[in-house]
Amino acid sequence: MTTKTSRRRIIWLGAAAASLGAAGAVAACGSQGQAGAGKALDTKQAVTVRYLTWWPLDRAGTIEEWKTGLKAEWPNINVETEVITLGEYNTKFQVAVASGTPPDVVLQNSHAQTRWYDSGVHLDLSSLVARDKINLQRDYALMGTELWCGKTYALPMDADSNAVFYNRTMLQKAGLRDPWADGKGDWSLDDMIELARKVTQDTDRDGKLDQWGIAWSYTHVSHVAQFVWTKGGDVADFQNMRYIIDQPASLEAHQQIYNWLVKEHLIISNAEISEIQRLYNKSNPFRTGRVAFHIRAVADVRQNTREISDAFEWDVLPFPKFSNTRPGIPLVSGNPHSVVAASKVQEAAYQWARFIAGPKGQEILALTQSLPALKSKQEVFLKTPPNHVKVFQEVYNKPYGIHFRHHYTNDSWDIYGAAVNRIYAGETPLQAGLQEANRQMNEKIQYGQCMPYKGLTIPIRPK
């Protein structure tokens, strides 16, 4: 059953936060979880900020550059980094909170972090943002939970929009028209499927497919949502905080994906992905050169460049339209930072998150990693290959969708993934399987005292 506020489920979170003690939880604030005007940070007294991140070690260079940049402005602030995996984040962060040893700043698991918003673990940054004249909604590409129930709980880092990577070399060898040939990149879902049919082949004639049309996260409800949105439907009712994957528009879209995956084999299966990544020693299927189209986020751009090198020519296309009146609706996401309310160094912790979100931190991100959330620094990233990388920035100028997030989003996703795997394996009828998954996913939904998406419609249409 969907619950607006499940005290049984979040009371242990609230109790854990309360156990940290009123003095620690308030720490220069007017009340728990809310920052006051704040007094100036002493630039002479040494301060250590404990920073929890799930970024892998290959991104450590960016973090070190951030630390150097922060030191130039705040020489007394030292940042100690703890790196964990995203898979262990929820458990480890909650244990730290419950034991009274939480970090000061966290790189969010944005699909779970709202549970800590609503239980008072995170600092409401509204007064600090106002003090520093930061306008998040005007100046940043947002991912959906920086602002939650009228409060500011996070500062942006990256703008993680989705588009379609494509293998130009594969299309050329097959004698197929490049969608960018006319300089417009205007294409449809029908175009993508037609091209996918022509390149899906058993190239070595050993009886097994070894080249595919599309790599798509078909076991992830938000990635499938891009197709449903484009067709005019949705997988969630944001206004009423519930999943609707059992509704006609979703059922029709899932049936089509079933046909492309199971009947026509245009979409490479997860088992086939594992096999070709092992054979080619690559970290995703597109980089093997055996897939024509990969629906993925901008964060893949630099890793694609490193792993593909000059093996084949590739570029980026916008998510394909359904028709001339129904544009493609891609997914956008992002990974913001939050400050822990119990931090004894709140101002220093905030300054770390603020530096990352500020012009210098965002330029470092653009030069070393991905598309920054700060709009004024996005052009720095757009100088990187491929030719049409700007497609990722342009996502925010057209209709787009976001993840449907609640306190236990990850749990709902696990239910969905298991359900569609059974459906696509022929173990469960599609409609019955999605209806049961929808029921179970909705049982996991929990949120706080407000309707967090009140007034929001998907797709989001930029003003």
Predicted feature descriptions by range:
Residues M1-R50, Y447-K463:
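Short, low-complexity disordered leader/linker segments with a strong preference
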Residues Q32-Q34, C149-M157, N162, Q172, ...:
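Extracytoplasmic/periplasmic solute-binding protein
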Residues L41, S110-A163, D190-D191, F227, ...:
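Hinge/lid segment of periplasmic solute-binding proteins
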Residues W66-R138, L147, K151-A154, Q172-G175, ...:
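Extracytoplasmic "Venus flytrap"/periplasmic binding protein-like
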Residues T68, A72-E73, N78, A174, ...:
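Extracytoplasmic/periplasmic substrate-recognition and gating elements
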Residues P75, D310, W314-L317, A366-A418, ...:
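Long, aromatic- and glycine/proline-rich binding clefts that accommodate carbohydrate-like moieties
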Residues A96, D104, D132-L171, W212-G213, ...:
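A structural signal for short loop-to-beta-strand junctions that line the ligand-binding cleft
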Residues I193-R197, Q239-E275, F319:
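Glycine-centered hinge/linker elements that transmit conformational signals in sensory
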